Amino acid sequence: ISKDEESFNKFCKTNEITKDDLQRLGFISSNGNMLFKNRIMFPILSFRNNIIAFGGRAIDDFGPKYLNSSDSVLYKKNRNLYFTNEFITATKKKGYAFIVEGYFDVLSLNKLGYANSASPSGTALTYQQLESVSKYTSKILICFDNDEAGLKATERVLEIKNQISKQVEIHCLNL
């Protein structure tokens, strides 16, 4: 949980991380405000299991409920997904991947033994994200929430699934 700005500043100073570095990496806004203050933090990994960005869930009623790192030299929201470090291995072993809406969905499925789950950090699943997952499996199960946003997102997935370069089997389950 990112609550203590003083400790964070001390860490940055000790590790020679400048405000410019933090801004380029999407941790502070252009006016110098910490973007992830008072949030539960979720590290967003690359497919090589390096942390490239963060998502944050507000722990109070101030600001947006969820906030993701801005696009940076390391992170492009339309290309990256949220998953745990076991995602690729589990996806290859099970032969399929779950795509769910959010961070807590991924963590809940992991706890149940489904480390083959990932999230676009919302409902805006893109062609590029589907293409990335298709490198590890040809079977993708879309499990968005059974609300208006989830249903619309499912329709968008059905529209873009034929653009994937590989033969991919996509099933949509609105839960």
Regions found by a protein language model. Name each.
Residues 125-126, 134-175:
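Conserved phosphate-handling catalytic cores of large alpha/beta enzymes
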Residues 5-136, 153-154:
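Phosphate-handling DNA/RNA-contact segment within nucleic-acid enzymes
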Residues 1-3, 174:
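Conserved alpha/beta enzyme-core scaffolds, especially Rossmann-like or related mixed alpha/beta domains
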